[in-house]
Every structure is written in structure tokens, then in C-alpha cells.
UniProtKB/Swiss-Prot annotation:
Belongs to the CitD family. The keyword Cytoplasm applies. GO terms for cellular component: cytoplasm. The keyword NAD does not apply. It is found in: Cytoplasm. It comes from Streptococcus uberis (strain ATCC BAA-854 / 0140J). The modification O-(phosphoribosyl dephospho-coenzyme A)serine is found at residue 14. This is Citrate lyase acyl carrier protein.
């Protein structure tokens, strides 16, 4: 999936995460800001990266501002931001459910 434009999903409310995706030339770069980064930073990055790989995204800069989001919220916000950035409004729920993340 190609990132065509900058897109955002989520909020800065407690227990949420704001994911901003930007087009990049190659690779996946994740810039994380979180009050729990020392404890959960590695896991937050892992969930974002795995979700991007499942979606077939390469060439993206992700800015994530975490406010204590659970893994399922991180995944959902990443999926929404990527679909918006790619200009897609249809989700393949069967495929997403098959990830077992």
C-alpha cells in the first residue's frame, strides 16, 4: 500500500494515541513520544511496525504521540491513518482479523 499524503488518526486524550503517517522514500521510521516509553516503547513500536508490514506499507514516516493506548488501539489508529493516507475508504476486515495480533 502506498502512502500518498499525510494523514492522522487518533487523539491526545488519555488512553489513546495520535498516529501521523507521512510519505517517505524507503523504509519505516517511527518517531515515538510517550510518557511510558521506558516501559512500553519497544512494544508500541513493534505493534506499529507489524501493522504496517501486514498492510504492505514501505516508505513511511510515522509520528506517534501515545497517551497510554492499548495494543488494539495502537493497531486501529495505525490502520485508519494508513488507509486515509492511501486514499482508501474500504477495509478488508477478513484479512485484518486473520493477523491475530
Amino acid at each position: 500500500m502506498d502512502i500518498m499524503q499525510t494523514a492522522v488518526a487518533g487523539s491526545l486524550e488519555s488512553s489513546d494515541i495520535m498516529i501521523t503517517v507521512n510519505p517517505a522514500t524507503d523504509g519505516i521510521t517511527i518517531d515515538l513520544e510517550s510518557s511510558v516509553e521506558k516501559q512500553f516503547g519497544r512494544r508500541i513500536r513493534q505493534v506499529i511496525e507489524e501493522t504496517l508490514k501486514h498492510l504492505g506499507v514501505n516508505g513511511v514516516l510515522v509520528q506517534a504521540v501515545d497517551k497510554g493506548a492499548l495494543d488494539c488501539t495502537i493497531q486501529a489508529r495505525t490502520i485508519a491513518a494508513v488507509h486515509r493516507a492511501a486514499g482508501l475508504d474500504q477495509y478488508n476486515w477478513k484479512e485484518i482479523d486473520s493477523w491475530n495480533v
